[in-house]
């Protein structure tokens, strides 16, 4: 049901987007303008030097985000936030903490991609901090085009990255996992399928084998991070910052850099950099989660969810439902029950049940 709704949403939204772009262009430039736009999309759908083509491509992906959230809601899979985390919502506090490792990786990627500290890179420090025009050539776009592209990237790319995370590491992984009764098998299959599908759907972008391995490695480690943190927050940030940096560095359209070359579509060096930085990001997120004592548990079907402090009548963070039904497999509760005047006289009112940790 949810998948059918998403497919329908995607088809209708793409038709609307196509009409919104092609009709005005056809009216102003005639049939040749429409043909040129089609050719531009076919040759470089994510060309950062063409704001029209780039915005069309990004918007066509961004619309998937509200689509998947509505699909989950309409299909009654659960609240829309069920894809966000084990708390059925975006954990904004945890998201803020994840900015630390995200910015560290962004800084490392900036140094690597610009070749900051070696000859022949995009940026030179010889006599000052400036673009190395001898290596990358001159910008081929106007200031107005560059400004438009940067605004589009900053506004749309975070939602584009979030849409892909919610589709692949949220909906697809949870759906596949729910089909398999053996939890460990379901988890492995969910990670494998989501990673393979994520990588294969990037083939139309022109990636070669190394480029697909690059994307696949990114997707695999992102899937593991989602399982380890119980949510999409860390991977959405990682995905967004990674894509923003790529687009920003390419936006000037440097004359000395051929984005259609074989090396631009993937190299073994690029794959190793992505693999290394992704593993480093996972490690930093793991340490941060342990330090912050991140709650990666998920509530059972009967468990109530509260915004803010847990009410006194709920009996504390570990809930005891009627007849012993509540959260699943928690350690026995030793603290006093709600409403007890004397902790020494307090005793559990039911068999303790609680929460299961995420893998």
Model-derived features with residue positions:
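N-terminal, membrane-interfacial amphipathic/helix-forming hydrophobic leader that caps
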Residues: 1-76, 260-359
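Hydrophobic alpha-helical membrane-insertion segments
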Residues: 2-22, 99-107, 233, 237-242
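Alpha-helical transmembrane segments of integral membrane proteins
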Residues: 4-5, 52-56, 60, 93-101, ...
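Short helix-terminus and kink motifs of transmembrane alpha helices
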Residues: 14, 18, 69, 73, ...
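Membrane interfacial helix motifs at helix-loop boundaries and amphipathic/re-entrant anchors
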Residues: 17-56, 114-146, 200-210, 251-271
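Juxtamembrane helix-loop-helix connectors linking adjacent transmembrane helices
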Residues: 56-58, 80-163, 173, 178-181, ...
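Cytoplasmic juxtamembrane regions at transmembrane-helix boundaries
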Residues: 74-95, 170-185, 189, 306-319
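Transmembrane helix-loop-helix hairpins at the membrane interface
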Residues: 149-309
């Amino acid at each position: 049901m949810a998948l059918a709704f998403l497919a329908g949403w995607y088809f209708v939204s793409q038709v609307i987007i196509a009409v919104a772009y092609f009709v005005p262009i056809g009216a102003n430039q005639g049939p040749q303008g429409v043909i040129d736009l089609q050719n531009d999309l076919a040759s470089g759908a994510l060309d950062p030097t063409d704001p029209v083509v780039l915005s069309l491509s990004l918007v066509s992906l961004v619309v998937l985000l509200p689509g998947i959230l509505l699909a989950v809601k309409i299909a009654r899979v659960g609240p829309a936030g069920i894809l966000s985390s084990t708390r059925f919502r975006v954990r904004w506090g945890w998201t803020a903490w994840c900015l630390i490792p995200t910015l560290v990786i962004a800084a490392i990627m900036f140094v690597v991609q610009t070749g900051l500290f070696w000859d022949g890179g995009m940026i030179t420090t010889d006599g000052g901090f400036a673009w190395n025009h001898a290596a990358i050539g001159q910008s081929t776009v106007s200031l107005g085009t560059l400004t438009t592209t940067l605004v589009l990237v900053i506004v749309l790319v975070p939602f584009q990255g979030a849409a892909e995370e919610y589709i692949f590491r949220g909906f697809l992984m949870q759906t596949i996992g729910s089909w398999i009764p053996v939890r460990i098998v379901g988890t492995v299959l969910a990670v494998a399928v989501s990673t393979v599908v994520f990588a294969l759907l990037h083939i139309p972008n022109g990636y070669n084998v190394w480029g697909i391995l690059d994307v696949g490695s990114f997707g695999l480690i992102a899937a593991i991070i989602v399982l380890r943190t119980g949510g999409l927050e860390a991977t959405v940030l990682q995905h967004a910052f990674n894509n923003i940096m790529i687009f920003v560095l390419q936006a000037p359209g440097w004359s000395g850099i051929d984005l259609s070359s074989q090396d631009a579509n993937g190299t073994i060096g690029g794959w190793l950099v992505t693999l290394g930085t992704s593993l480093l990001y996972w490690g930093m997120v793991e340490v941060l989660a342990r330090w912050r004592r991140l709650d990666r548990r998920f509530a059972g079907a009967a468990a109530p969810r509260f915004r803010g402090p847990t009410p006194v009548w709920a009996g504390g963070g570990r809930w005891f439902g009627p007849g012993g039904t509540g959260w699943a497999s928690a350690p026995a509760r030793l603290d006093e029950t709600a409403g007890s005047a004397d902790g020494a006289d307090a005793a559990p009112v039911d068999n303790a049940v609680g929460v299961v940790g995420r893998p």
